Amino acid sequence: MLGVAGVLVTQMMTGGGAAHAITTPAKVLSYTQAPGLAQSLGAPQLRAEIVQKGNGEARNVVDAVYEDSTGPAAKSGPVIILFIGGNLSGSASSFISGFTGLLPTAFVTRAGALGGQAACVPGVNGHPAECAWADNDTFGLFASPGLDASQLAAQLRQIRPLVEHVVKK
């Protein structure tokens, strides 16, 4: 599922700014965490791959799979979103340029109220839609087989403030 993630992590450089933490709450919006689904989709293995390919750049990396079986988008079946995020030393520009450069169908989108940069790639040929954000010290990757890239971008902007928090000193 997020095949470009490992490549993107290796392209990061150093960054700065306010420190943030990424969390995986039990519930975000109408989505509930689905640990069994995370295991079956290989989320922990993907998280480990991102950490390994990051060569020390990715840290505090977390993963979760969220499922919504009751909201409006779930009319034709449960909507699943895989999320992997953490802290990353690097520039948002480098991360997003890497994402859009690797995938010709990728497009830049708004990162939302927390700033930074974001991009998405439509799902094709059985691969899920993917969206990513990066700012001065965090990154997040979302994938969903049930949402198109524009819908997933909207979910990124709504979910990100629920998973990214300023670290209190």
Spans of features found by a protein language model:
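Membrane-interface extramembranous regions at the lipid-water interface
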Residues: A26, H165-V166
